[in-house]
């Protein structure tokens, strides 16, 4: 009798101890770069499907940056390329061909060298069929 009681108690303890709640996922907007105080928003462009590229112009007197991040909101977006134009006339293309889901961001893109003054950043992209208007934001640190 004691053995049966001990087995029942052990079974209940194992059942309670092994049960778990599924991981709670944060909504997509929780991953936005905006709340991070150490990142600066350099600009944004709405992708309306009529143009396949846009420029975000940056005030080169403002400051220099080491890293970039792209945030895509509202709709999916196919990013074919990103070209960073520096104040010294050189260019950098980090090979960012990627399909962004709505409300997602890129990995951190390290710029070559140390601190660099950015003149402009060129986005080459396209809307995905069936999607709405996507907003592409450029953040820098």
Locations of regions flagged by a protein language model:
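Bacterial N-terminal signal peptides that target proteins for export
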Residues: 1-7
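Exposed aromatic-hydrophobic patches
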Residues: 54-59, 105-113
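Short, surface-exposed beta-strand/strand-loop-strand elements in extracellular ectodomains
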Residues: 73-95, 133-140
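Beta-strand-centric surfaces of beta-sandwich/beta-rich domains
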Residues: 49, 81-83, 89-110
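C-terminal motif of bacterial Sec signal peptides marking the signal peptidase cleavage site
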Residues: 16-17
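Short, surface-exposed binding/anchoring microloops in extracellular/periplasmic proteins
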Residues: 48-77
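Noncatalytic modules at the cell exterior or secretory-pathway interfaces
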Residues: 63-70, 113-128
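Transition segment at domain starts
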Residues: 22-58, 94
């Amino acid at each position: 009798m004691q053995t049966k009681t001990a087995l029942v108690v052990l079974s209940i303890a194992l059942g309670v101890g092994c049960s778990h709640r599924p991981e709670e996922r944060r909504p997509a907007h929780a991953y936005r770069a905006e709340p991070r105080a150490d990142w600066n928003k350099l600009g944004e462009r709405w992708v309306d499907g009529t143009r396949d590229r846009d420029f975000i112009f940056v005030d080169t007197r403002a400051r220099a940056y080491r890293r970039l991040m792209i945030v895509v909101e509202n709709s999916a977006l196919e990013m074919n390329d990103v070209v960073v134009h520096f104040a010294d006339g050189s260019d950098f293309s980090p090979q960012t061909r990627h399909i962004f889901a709505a409300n997602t961001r890129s990995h951190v893109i390290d710029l070559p060298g140390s601190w660099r003054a950015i003149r402009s950043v060129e986005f080459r992209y396209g809307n995905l069929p069936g999607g709405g208007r996507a907003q592409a934001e450029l953040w820098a640190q």
